[in-house]
Amino acid sequence: MTLKELITRIQPLDEAAMEAARRRQDALAKPPRSLGRLEDLSIQLAGITGKVQNTMDKTHLLVFAADNGVVEEGVSSAPQSVTLMQTVNLTRAKTGASVLCKHFGAGITVCDVGVNAIVREPAVLDRKIAFGTQNIAKGPAMTREQAEKAILIGAQLAMDTPADALGVGEMGIGNTTTSSAVLAVLLGVPVETVTGRGGGITDESFQKKKQVIAQAIALNQPNGKDPVDVLQKVGGFDLAAMCGAFLGAAASHRPVVIDGFISVVAALCAARLCPTARDYFVPSHLSYEIGYRLALEELRLEPIFQLSMRLGEGSGCPLAFQVLSAACGIINDMATFDQAGIDDGYLEEIREGDKFTVEAQK
């Protein structure tokens, strides 16, 4: 499968199924739009799957692990060895994301696409492209061939994973640096507006981080109109594979949950490659990282939660899976007005005037 073939598999949402879901929601025994975002999600799910009634019996988080050569520049407080340790711990329900997956019964797959070490844990899926990327402050992160390979690895894993919904997470020291670089280029904005402190760094290191990102962009001159070029020159193997996972989920007609900052940048890359893919995305939480909101605004999406989270790993995805499940439960199991023995004639005027929309309350 080529990248072009992958993109051609992604189809627009099923408008007929969405309209049927809207009619079903209007027929349920409740004031119009009174379940708000849950109704919106159920309609989105109908468009994604082509079915009005869906389930979230099986949900799965995909975590892509890789190291980033830019850590040589002192942009992270954590040593690079943490990537390997946490990659292994993710498979043992010992990290934030994996504990949440275990708690809610979601599956998790950890995929090594570029850890700078030999990963001896059998539970980690080996798709290593190289032992980390090159230092973007000194040259391109990878070759274009490697970037496309990473995208297709992520896409194939998403398509091969049986689940009603997928989530996309990561593990890689230094990846807020690469994500900020990619986002700055895609949006054409100053580095300072999209660069946060990541896992936590001193003021001196924070200034260094911004300088390194600006230096990397100036040196490599990525083309902001070509997401693959941007990923190749200032991105990471994890980011590229995550981008592919978003595309793969859309190509296989499954909703795919965005986690935090790295995840939303990967989602934006996917949407730039195939704008239709955006309609399959479900943002989980409003990350505390500074660039997250800008990326989400560019995608024209709204997060479900605001929990001041900034862990990454995919930690927001298991929480969002529960909301998707609730959205399915509402449209599947609530009684209609007819079933409840209620005459809903009194709502006709309200329905026609959209008196229960958020805008109508202002």
Predicted regions and their residues:
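N-terminal loops that bind phosphate or other acidic moieties
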Residues: T2-K362
